[in-house]
Amino acid sequence: MSKLVLVLNCGSSSLKFAVVDAENGAEHLSGLAECLHLPEARIKWKLDGKHEAQLGNGAAHEEALAFMVETILASKPELSENLAAIGHRVVHGGEQFTQSALITDEVLKGIEDCATLAPLHNPAHIIGIKAAQKSFPALKNVAVFDTAFHQTMPEEAYLYALPYNLYKEHGIRRYGMHGTSHLFITREVASLLNKPVEEVNIINCHLGNGASVCAVKNGQSVDTSMGLTPLEGLVMGTRCGDIDPAIIFHLHDTLGYSVEKINTMLTKESGLAGLTEVTSDCRFVEDNYGQKEEATRAMDVFCHRLAKYVAGYTATLEGRLDAITFTGGIGENSAPIREMVLNRLGIFGIEVDSEANLKARFGGEGVITTANSRIPAMVISTNEELVIAEDTARLAGL
């Protein structure tokens, strides 16, 4: 039986897709539709070479999925005819979903109910699920939740020091994101160290335009930096991460900012973009560090925040840390950021191997600390699509 899984990741203005063989991990197709709802909506894909096409003025998720089915997959019948199931990345599953789920009307309703916790993402996921069901009515659909891996966090880690009824009645707590990536890295470290997953203790840094840290104890998430939403925690591309909540009142009451303006500023105009006042692109920050004041400022704040989180999470692991790991677009490719962060953690006996660190870029992986380092640090490429494909195959009975 075929184990080809169509993996869909619908963002607020994008649709990422791939066809993955859940049995051997081979990726037969990958692509991205971006700038959806805008005049420049376009789609790029890799299938027997690289391709790109315009989707038309204001094209939405439905049009992008239709193009993928009717144009891209139609050009490769051996793929479309052998698709066995569809897996969907879903950002927020709240407390209702502690693991991946076969999509039923009840599960779809649950995803809709969680939309208040991820208003930019969950509605887009629902559109993608319904469009996929329409395009492939015979295939089973599976939801794989970013929040599920973090449902093992203890109460002391996920509760906020707010009136307890806000949690009991409204579910206001830490949920965390990037769970699928953190899970994949945990499994990879177990394999590299030749240990059962249940014995792995790591601190994983998933660094991209969105970024989070996760403390993993005995193979389970015990703390993570993102909170109720993906806004909390690290400095990100355009998101502020941790701030004094009273800043919001000051912006509103003293400076006259509207709630909408504050929300836009914290989510789309802060982070690296806010600190540089130029760009959210980490490559600019890295290339101009020490030369341009704005780049130096942004990189120092980014690395300070990340090192502080990593150091703090050692306390949750109670004495044993097998590895510090870096993944995601920045984590996998930015040798300077990795070195700056690890050098700030010298108190733990960490020694960076600068040559190995420099080699571990652009698909390179491996240990980036010296043999004398008390704690190893590793670069590992994440593969969320594979985790989604594997869970989908399992739940779809492939």
Swiss-Prot record:
GO annotation, biological process: acetate metabolic process; acetyl-CoA biosynthetic process
Residue numbers binding Mg(2+): N9, E384
Catalytic activity from the UniProt record: acetate + ATP = acetyl phosphate + ADP
Annotated InterPro entries: Ac/propionate_kinase, Aliphatic_acid_kin_short-chain, Aliphatic_acid_kinase_CS, ATPase_NBD
CDD domains with a match to the protein in the record: ASKHA_NBD_AcK_PK
Site (Transition state stabilizer): H178, R239
Co-factor requirement: Mg(2+); Mn(2+)
Record-linked PROSITE patterns: ACETATE_KINASE_1, ACETATE_KINASE_2
Residues noted as binding ATP in the record, renumbered to the chain: K16, H206, L207, G208, N209, G210, D281, C282, R283, G329, I330, G331, E332, N333
Keywords: ATP-binding, Cytoplasm, Kinase, Magnesium, Metal-binding, Nucleotide-binding, Transferase
Family recorded in the similarity comment: Belongs to the acetokinase family.
Function: Catalyzes the formation of acetyl phosphate from acetate and ATP. Can also catalyze the reverse reaction.
Name this protein carries in UniProt: Acetate kinase 1
Species assigned in the record: Vibrio vulnificus (strain YJ016)
